[in-house]
């Protein structure tokens, strides 16, 4: 009798995806982040579900319902901080996952990469709406500022903003719909992640060398299941350390003040994982230009496969491209720092230079360097 794992219609799918999947024998720990993102998503959905049982999406009671969760619900503080810091871990894994894709040329799997860009947008939208729900000062003003950006769209801008708000300002209608969308989007993200995996398994995984690994494959289980478990242990170690020792490290103190439309915080800023895009937005004096730059800062990822001019897939054997890649990483860290600073000298000019460098590196310098490396190798 054959194994049920290989014959049962449902088990067969799981078997081909996580057990008997042929995987390259040389993939490094940079390939752990896909599974870590899956774990993060499960943590977020489960903690979010329990939070939703106690949360009320009304402007009068939202803030106090979050306080009630932290004070009165059994382990409510743990669930709330796991959810808040779980989002930070999610984005750390996301950025590392995208960085890995850029470095090793994984973007040449076009369908997988484009679904990934779509996933990034969906997760960012989910996180933004989640930040509004506690209805603190930064929640309210963050929602007001970011949704207001849509008014820069010609002709339909102001109507669109009012339509999203459900009125003439961010109010009860806005909070209710944001809660509804924040609840449904993670399930859409989970479905998209399934499609992401489907497309990945059509081609098989890339590997650090960027060369075909068809001649040297090993089964996913037990080799990479054990390797992934190590990554999961590190994830849990960092997440639990954050939650139990410094749960508010990555949050904003202003969000412990209930939302007040009559009092603007001195410095409105989003969560840390949006700061790089926020810095790019602020570096352009024109409103519409800023919004376009903000969208392009993420959408530029979709153009990367078109800008691949190298005859090698991976950056493993391309030292000049490696230099530019790490300059890009440093530039993104600089942008993240600038996004959290007030709009004054010297931060304005640093932000503008870092924004120009960001687009220059991706759109111009990296493709030119790849051509140069091709010529150096006399190909």
Swiss-Prot record:
Q: Return the PROSITE patterns for the record.
A: CYTB_CTER, CYTB_NTER
The record's listing under Gene3D superfamilies reads:
Cytochrome Bc1 Complex, Chain C (1.20.810.10)
- Record-listed heme b b562 binding positions: 83, 182
Q: Which UniProt keywords apply?
A: Electron transport, Heme, Iron, Membrane, Metal-binding, Mitochondrion, Mitochondrion inner membrane, Respiratory chain, Transmembrane, Transmembrane helix, Transport, Ubiquinone
Cellular component terms per the entry's GO annotation? mitochondrial inner membrane; respiratory chain complex III
Which amino acids does the record list as binding a ubiquinone?
Answer: 201
Q: Which cofactor does it need?
A: heme b
> GO terms for biological process?
mitochondrial electron transport, ubiquinol to cytochrome c
Which sites bind heme b b566?
97, 196
In terms of InterPro entries, this protein maps to: Cyt_b/b6_C, Cyt_b/b6_C_sf, Cyt_b/b6_N, Cytb/b6-like_sf, Cytochrome_b, Cytochrome_b_C_euk/bac, Cytochrome_b_N_euk/bac, Di-haem_cyt_TM
Record-annotated membrane-spanning stretches: 33-53, 77-98, 113-133, 178-198, 226-246, 288-308, 320-340, 347-367
Q: What does this protein do?
A: Component of the ubiquinol-cytochrome c reductase complex (complex III or cytochrome b-c1 complex) that is part of the mitochondrial respiratory chain. The b-c1 complex mediates electron transfer from ubiquinol to cytochrome c. Contributes to the generation of a proton gradient across the mitochondrial membrane that is then used for ATP synthesis.
User: What is the similarity comment for this entry?
Assistant: Belongs to the cytochrome b family.
> Quaternary arrangement and interactors, per the entry?
The cytochrome bc1 complex contains 11 subunits: 3 respiratory subunits (MT-CYB, CYC1 and UQCRFS1), 2 core proteins (UQCRC1 and UQCRC2) and 6 low-molecular weight proteins (UQCRH/QCR6, UQCRB/QCR7, UQCRQ/QCR8, UQCR10/QCR9, UQCR11/QCR10 and a cleavage product of UQCRFS1). This cytochrome bc1 complex then forms a dimer.
Q: State the remark under miscellaneous.
A: Heme 1 (or BL or b562) is low-potential and absorbs at about 562 nm, and heme 2 (or BH or b566) is high-potential and absorbs at about 566 nm.
Q: What is this protein called?
A: Cytochrome b
Q: Which gene encodes it?
A: MT-CYB
